[in-house]
């Protein structure tokens, strides 16, 4: 279990989790408040 925690704290895993969270957050913001520059018909 100790090795698994060390693996989860490595830079690529942390970066992947952070970018996934950021992308999901941006997608949800754009779903509720669409960008006015994009015309959705």
UniProtKB/Swiss-Prot annotation:
SUPFAM superfamilies: Subunit IX of photosystem I reaction centre, PsaJ. GO terms for biological process: photosynthesis. InterPro entries: PSI_PsaJ, PSI_PsaJ_sf. The chain crosses the membrane at residues 7-27. Its main location: plastid. GO terms for cellular component: chloroplast thylakoid membrane; photosystem I. Keywords: Chloroplast, Membrane, Photosynthesis, Photosystem I, Plastid, Thylakoid, Transmembrane, Transmembrane helix. Gene3D superfamilies: Single helix bin (1.20.5.510). It is found in: Plastid, Chloroplast thylakoid membrane. The keyword Ribonucleoprotein does not apply. It is a single-pass membrane protein. It holds the Pfam family PSI_PsaJ. PANTHER family: PHOTOSYSTEM I REACTION CENTER SUBUNIT IX (PTHR36082:SF2), PTHR36082. May help in the organization of the PsaE and PsaF subunits. Belongs to the PsaJ family. This is Photosystem I reaction center subunit IX. It comes from Stigeoclonium helveticum (Green alga). The gene is psaJ.
């Amino acid at each position: 279990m100790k090795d698994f925690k060390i693996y989860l704290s490595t830079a690529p895993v942390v970066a992947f989790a952070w970018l996934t969270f950021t992308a999901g957050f941006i997608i949800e913001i754009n779903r509720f408040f669409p960008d006015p520059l994009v015309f959705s018909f």
